[in-house]
Amino acid sequence: MCPRPRRAVLLGLGVAMSAIAGCRETAPSTTQTSDGGPEPTGRSGDTQTDGGGETTRQATVAEGGESATRADETETSELDLREANVVDVTLQSAGGRAVEFSVTLYHDDDGEDGYADWWQVETLAGDRLGRRELLHAHSTAPFTRSETIEVPEGTTCVVVRGHDQTHGYGGQAMVVDTESGATRAVQQGPEPAEFDDGDCP
């Protein structure tokens, strides 16, 4: 019996290894939050940067299985990262007047003494409807956190503001139409701005 050529054996091993490697699946990575729950690092809805100084986002409002989408871009180089900037807001109906707000903040938690410690939803008159507390720093990359908030009947336009421990409110806020999910970014500067019906998207 003639021994198989060495080249044929190596080729067979290479094909087998390629097939095995192609079958491997990687589960989404998670990090542990200081409040005990896992935080997906590859969560859908997180803001992704394209590496060229811009952040591309797509906002989605879903109710009753239907969704409306809006896509736009924000020049992140224009943001003052000392402020807790709101760069994206998506809404999901949670039944009745309850709405789940998923808010993406962009703040330099690494380069500041304090970190972005909450975001909140307000009426146009400035009355707080709800707040999402943030218990620890989140580096400098944009990050998204969600909270379910009751929106009063007749309220169709709200303001979402970020807050950080050092500078308070300021930076970019987002005015949101709670029925369509449309958003409008507003540069407030270092102090919180006042809003009215004319600011709604």
From Swiss-Prot:
Q: Where is the lipid attached (S-archaeol cysteine)?
A: 23
- The N-acetylcysteine modification is found at 23
Biased composition (Basic and acidic residues) is annotated at 69-78
Q: Where in the cell is it found?
A: Cell membrane
* Naturally occurring in which organism (per UniProt): Halomicrobium mukohataei (strain ATCC 700874 / DSM 12286 / JCM 9738 / NCIMB 13541)
Q: Which UniProt keywords apply?
A: Acetylation, Cell membrane, Lipoprotein, Membrane, Signal
May I ask which residue range the UniProt record assigns to the signal sequence? 1-22
Q: Which residues lie within the region annotated Disordered?
A: 25-78, 182-201
Major subcellular site: membrane
Its recorded name reads Putative lipoprotein Hmuk_2215
Lineage of producing organism: Archaea, Methanobacteriati, Methanobacteriota, Stenosarchaea group, Halobacteria
A GO cellular-component term linked to this record: plasma membrane
Question: Per UniProt, what is the membrane topology?
Answer: Lipid-anchor
Asked if the record carries the keyword Membrane, the reply is yes
